[in-house]
Amino acid sequence: MFCFQCEQTMRSETGAAGCGGPKGVCGKDEATADLQDVLIHQLKGIGQYVTRLQALGRRDAEADSFILYALFTTLTNVNFNRARFVEMIATAARLRDRLRDAYAEAASEAGQTPEALGGAAAFIPADSLVGLLAQANVASVRAGAEAVGEDVIGMRALLLYGLKGVAAYAHHAEVLGETREAIADGVARVLDLLAGDPVDLELMLEEALALGRVNFTVMEALDAANTGTYGAPTPTPVRITPVEGKAILVSGHDLRDLHAILEATKDTGINVYTHGEMLPAHGYPKLHAYSHLAGNYGTAWQNQQTEFAAFPGPIVMTSNCLIEPQPLYRNRIFTAGPVGWPGLRHIADGDFSPVVQAAKALPGFTRTEPERTVTTGFGREAVLGAAEQVIGAVKAGAIRHFFLIGGCDGAAPGRNYYTEFAEQAPDDTVVLTLGCGKYRFNTHEFGTIGGLPRMLDIGQCNDAYSALVIAQALAGAFECGVNDLPLSLVVSWFEQKAAAVFLTLLALGVRNVRLGPTLPGFLTPALLDILVNRFGVRPITSAEADIADALAPKAAA
């Protein structure tokens, strides 16, 4: 086992990063980690055939969908169930064989001789768990490191981990019916590239930026899927204290699963609560219309073991981030979609009736607590609807600066920086936020500025798309570039969705992003130098110093 894909990966005193041994920091055991590597190796081979079929005018929707789902299962804190990975490895082998035959047929019909592909495209997985684990060394993210060096391994990892984030967002869009050929083509292109074990750093950097542009398309598609299905988010106060009654808790990111649970509990007297990244769901009109969507319970993912133990009903994990379930709630937590943990009940078919039955059998909340709320739903349409008011406040000097403080939360030391940054931001500045990092400060009383709330919750991590559209619209209004706006991006990262968003920011030319609490362990000093020198990426320091730097007058170019 070797894994260094997330922010919490083990780090030695010398600075070397990576989890090994029997279990990673996230709780992923060695066997599961190795099986994930084997699956990704197979996906590279599938990508080789998909790209060649695309070049011959053939498309394969099953392959496109499987790639997204399978990559999603390998994200941090998504699926820990080795049996599911053994099944997916077998499925991948059958799919690869079918694609190989389809490619040979298509090439023959086009009067071409098909390439004899080796490596990942020719990989034959063992037919036993022991055999699969013995094959993991050829699939490791560090395979060939002694020959190619750490910089190449790190750049390949940046591509792979960004690709995982892209796939996760694309899967969320796909389940709501939003698919685009450009997305499937971009994903397969990177898999095909990685299958060839690239060593050219400049080529891989260009491909990483191209992947960032693909991710912008993916986030646009997911935005279209979410708003097309559930309406454009509107500013909505969300109760954060419970009400008396039976209850279900829904965590993760998947709005379709939340909608299905709301439908399944309609007229049952069961209340539904969101958790973590599901908080922004309350801003979507068609979801908010369910009167039994009672509020948001708890905070960010890393606090779930305490929060889930105290919740008096069943819990559904619809996507990342799952932590090892504790005995106090293990028998009442369900997984759905790409999520998995050995021994937990899995909802594979969208039928949440077992969850409803569990809610009826559990006590629920026995009393209604005094109401407290937070506000979400400041999506691009809501903010741009007030654009004249915002622009007027900037021109009048009421708003001096915008801080986008967003991204993933986590348990590692140093994340209090984001709380301090938001709370220390001067009263003439606006705080925009997205992702579960908002829980660090979203109950703080920020007040108003120019008739607008000083803290605007834009949504989930994928709603970075809304933030970018807002920034581009403001740049157009002020007749300047995004980098010339009074706007600073202060990003907290944790896993691979954040890596995809980061690549999008770089691809769109957004400079001077502050990134923390630590920099990715897979990026070597040489790769970090590239990001610093070419894109102005900088690590966070202290809230006080970084605020002062952001607000300091900038020298004329």
UniProtKB/Swiss-Prot annotation:
Binds 1 [4Fe-4S] cluster. The gene is hcp. [4Fe-4S] cluster binds at residues 3, 6, 19, 26. One of its GO terms (biological process) is response to hydrogen peroxide. GO terms for molecular function: 4 iron, 4 sulfur cluster binding; hydroxylamine reductase activity; metal ion binding; peroxidase activity. Pfam families: Prismane. One of its GO terms (cellular component) is cytoplasm. This is Hydroxylamine reductase. Keywords: 4Fe-4S, Cytoplasm, Iron, Iron-sulfur, Metal-binding, Oxidoreductase. It comes from Acidiphilium cryptum (strain JF-5). The modification Cysteine persulfide is found at residue 408. Hybrid [4Fe-2O-2S] cluster binds at residues 253, 277, 321, 408, 436, 461, 495, 497. Catalyzes the reduction of hydroxylamine to form NH(3) and H(2)O. It is found in: Cytoplasm. NCBIfam families: hybrid_clust (TIGR01703), PRK05290.1 (NF003658). Its EC number is 1.7.99.1.
